[in-house]
């Protein structure tokens, strides 16, 4: 048996889950279980410990496949057999005709996070694997993401008082499949995972060829880990720089920056300072500007104008930027006139 297909034993489950289910856990948890092998192994592993905090298993029925309801009921039966409570969460209402997978993902997390907060849970655990991480990195590379996006899925992400946790993110999917087989935990295979109509399904067909050239899932995941470390350092530098560059005199709801100070920053830091300043004045509801657009404005227009001592007025990411007299003011973009 290869290491990549070795089942997890109780000790490894404990090492990965004790922080969230053991004596030092901050509170209860919700386990997101679709019925596939990854999340089934998560549920089975949690049941084996046993948990010292309240555990709720949740399955989202997206209503996209005729068999989805029966699969959710199968998860409920296995959860009952393992001694864990279970809830089925239904995504109801009209479904979009385009970007269906994105909409389904957003609905899934909304339902799961709502349940976690309703339960007073401290954490929501999902069973994303090394394979998922590699696919995510490739998808974001295809979409033109920068270093932050190529950092992939975070092992732990804090959402207010709730932690979104992926305890299996460094494990190959094959180990979780082997675990279910060894333990006799039944699971289903979603045909949508290999559906060539969707980008992720198409990339799954390509990945064996990339691995043959050396671009394995493990190397893609390691790249994501390195980029997350680098991004954390750049983010800290950008936060400090934004504080240092802030100047008085901004309009209410706006921000004023020392433009010359912005121009002497390393380009990667300056880019993040501009993005943070825009996010601050626009607020959390606006869609952030795409990285390519940020780069075009900063490197193609703003920095050259600062160097020339010139003026500039443009919009970016929902903000109005005005460069004049060595200062850069940012304010929310005024609403467009109807007609």
UniProtKB/Swiss-Prot annotation:
Its function, per the record, reads: Ligates lysine onto the cytidine present at position 34 of the AUA codon-specific tRNA(Ile) that contains the anticodon CAU, in an ATP-dependent manner. Cytidine is converted to lysidine, thus changing the amino acid specificity of the tRNA from methionine to isoleucine.
- GO CC terms: cytoplasm
Alphabetical list of Gene3D superfamilies matching this protein: HUPs (3.40.50.620)
Keyword tags: ATP-binding, Cytoplasm, Ligase, Nucleotide-binding, tRNA processing
Question: EC number(s) for this protein?
Answer: 6.3.4.19
Name recorded for this polypeptide: tRNA(Ile)-lysidine synthase
Catalyzed reactions per annotation: cytidine(34) in tRNA(Ile2) + L-lysine + ATP = lysidine(34) in tRNA(Ile2) + AMP + diphosphate + H(+)
Family stated for the protein in its record: Belongs to the tRNA(Ile)-lysidine synthase family.
Question: Record's SUPFAM superfamilies?
Answer: Adenine nucleotide alpha hydrolases-like (SSF52402), MesJ substrate recognition domain-like (SSF82829)
Locate the residues binding ATP.
34-39
Please classify the protein's predominant subcellular localization into one broad category.
cytoplasm
| Single annotated GO MF | tRNA(Ile)-lysidine synthase activity
**Which PANTHER family does this chain map to?**
TRNA(ILE)-LYSIDINE SYNTHASE-RELATED (PTHR43033:SF1)
InterPro entries per UniProt = Rossmann-like_a/b/a_fold, TilS/TtcA_N, tRNA_Ile_lys_synt, tRNA_Ile_lys_synt_N
Record remark on domains? The N-terminal region contains the highly conserved SGGXDS motif, predicted to be a P-loop motif involved in ATP binding.
Which taxonomic lineage does the organism of this UniProt entry have?
Answer: Bacteria, Pseudomonadati, Pseudomonadota, Alphaproteobacteria, Hyphomicrobiales
Pfam families named among the record's database cross-references: ATP_bind_3
Any one GO BP annotation for this protein: tRNA modification
Q: Where in the cell is it found?
A: Cytoplasm
């Amino acid at each position: 048996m290869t290491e990549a297909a070795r089942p997890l034993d109780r000790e490894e489950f404990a090492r990965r889950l004790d922080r969230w289910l053991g004596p030092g856990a901050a509170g209860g948890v919700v386990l997101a279980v679709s019925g596939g092998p990854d999340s089934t192994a998560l549920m089975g592993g949690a049941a084996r410990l046993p948990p010292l905090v309240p555990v709720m298993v949740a399955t989202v029925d997206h209503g996209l496949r005729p068999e989805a309801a029966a699969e959710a009921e199968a998860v409920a039966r296995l959860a009952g057999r393992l001694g864990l409570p279970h809830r089925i969460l239904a995504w109801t209402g009209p479904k979009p005709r385009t970007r269906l997978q994105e909409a389904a993902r957003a609905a899934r997390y909304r339902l799961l996070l709502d349940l976690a907060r309703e339960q007073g849970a401290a954490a929501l655990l999902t069973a994303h694997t090394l394979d998922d991480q590699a696919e995510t990195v490739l998808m974001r590379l295809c979409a033109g993401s920068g270093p932050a996006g190529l950092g992939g899925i975070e092992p732990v992400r804090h959402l207010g008082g709730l932690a979104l946790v992926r305890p299996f993110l460094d494990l190959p999917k094959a180990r979780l499949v082997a675990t279910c087989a060894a333990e006799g935990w039944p699971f289903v295979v979603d045909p949508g995972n290999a559906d060539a109509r969707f980008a992720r399904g198409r990339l799954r067909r390509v990945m064996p060829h990339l691995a043959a050239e050396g671009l394995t899932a493990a190397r893609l995941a390691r790249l994501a880990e390195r980029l997350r470390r680098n991004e954390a350092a750049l983010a800290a530098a950008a936060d400090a720089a934004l504080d240092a560059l802030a100047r008085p005199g901004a309009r209410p709801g706006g921000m004023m920056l020392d433009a010359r100070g912005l121009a002497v920053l390393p380009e990667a830091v300056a880019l993040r300072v501009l993005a943070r300043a825009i996010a601050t004045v626009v607020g959390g509801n606006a869609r952030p500007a795409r990285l390519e657009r940020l780069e075009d404005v900063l490197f193609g227009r703003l920095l050259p104008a600062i160097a020339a001592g010139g003026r500039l007025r443009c919009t970016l990411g929902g903000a109005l930027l005005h460069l004049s007299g060595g200062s850069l003011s940012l304010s929310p973009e005024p609403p467009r006139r109807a007609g």
